[in-house]
Amino acid sequence: MRKNCDISTVVVQIDEFGIYIGNASDKEPTWKVDLVPYKQSWVPISIVTTIIQRYCLNTFNCLAEIVRVVLVLDIFVTRKQKKELCDGLFNTLNVPITLWICAPLTAILSTSTRDAIIVDIGMKETKFIVILDLCILMHYTKTSKRSLSTVLERMADCFKLNNKKNSQKLLEDEEFAVTEALMKSLLKSRVPSKPTEELYQLTDQEAYFRYSDILPLAETTCQTNKTERGSSFNDAEKIRVPSWIANAGIEALFEGSDAGGSDIADQALPNVLLSLYRILPIDIRRIMSKLIVFNGILPSLPGWYQRFQNEMTSRGLAIKAVPGQTTADMMAWNGASTTCESQLDYDPDDPKHLRHSIVESPLLYGQDQYFNGENAPEWW
């Protein structure tokens, strides 16, 4: 137990295996609670709050010194579940609750690269994340002499046209307002982004495709016959992909899998990625096809990468597939704690300053924004 009551940011990660909790300044979580006994994909709020309370009382011997709780959700949950969990924690602990969109930044932290597609293969879900290169958008706004709002309006127009072609719901004005606020916070965020090696202008359509993953995401549940899925994917019923990926690509993830799941590398994932590439402009397709980064247990199997690369090459996409540099279970927790430290410009003698020093970022969407009646982005 710590002798002094330190002002602290507590990081809590919830994934499909357990709850991890620790101080943001620590390199690894202090506690782990196994979720297997609960036999469910979602954790009751009462369990999470109880664990946080016990940890804080045991570590700090008090609850009053907690400044913020950063909640890392490395699991597929609905927007309603996220809001209920944040509200429940806030009502119990009475401290700001910050939600962490772990996938995009975790990918950046684990690969230290740009222009890559992250495929996060989990036991219960598969995520596709396109890494953002913010320098390109900032350069675009400068060289075109257009305001950020104008650029966003044009991107929104492209989004409307794209949705119209696919007979999808048009982007509402209020959703665009959220997107605009999100983009502004992106541009002033302290989250580091690798500098681009070659700055170039993007057309409006290219700008949309380049940054379309910050627009609303479609949370799609893919139900297929278990006999069509490999044993490694018996629980993989949920896929989270951007709404602009064709539905055919979503379904393709579970097509052609044999009983052992060995065809995932040879058929399923190549099918999805090809569906993604087909809807990208050629220039953007070239950029995004440079690198595929895989996280998860399945890609760690011997020969998996070679089989995947051979299949993609035979289909005309000579890409490079690599594992994430950080493959530990605590990748999301480490990413959250690292970013918390970088975004906390704190003075230990000024608790009030620390309380207001977290920079706005789409990667850190606080419960106080919910509390103030602000709408969360649809993709959140």
UniProtKB/Swiss-Prot annotation:
| Keyword Nucleus assigned | yes
Q: Which organism is it from?
A: Schizosaccharomyces pombe (strain 972 / ATCC 24843)
Q: Which InterPro entries match?
A: Actin (IPR004000), ATPase_NBD (IPR043129)
Q: Sorted alphabetically, which keywords does the UniProt record give?
A: Cytoplasm, Cytoskeleton, Nucleus
The UniProt entry, under Gene3D superfamilies, shows:
3.30.420.40, Actin, Chain A, domain 4 (3.90.640.10)
Read off the SUPFAM superfamilies from this record.
Actin-like ATPase domain
What Gene Ontology biological process does one annotation of this record name?
microtubule-based movement
Q: What is this protein called?
A: Actin-like protein arp10
State the similarity comment: Belongs to the actin family. ARP10 subfamily.
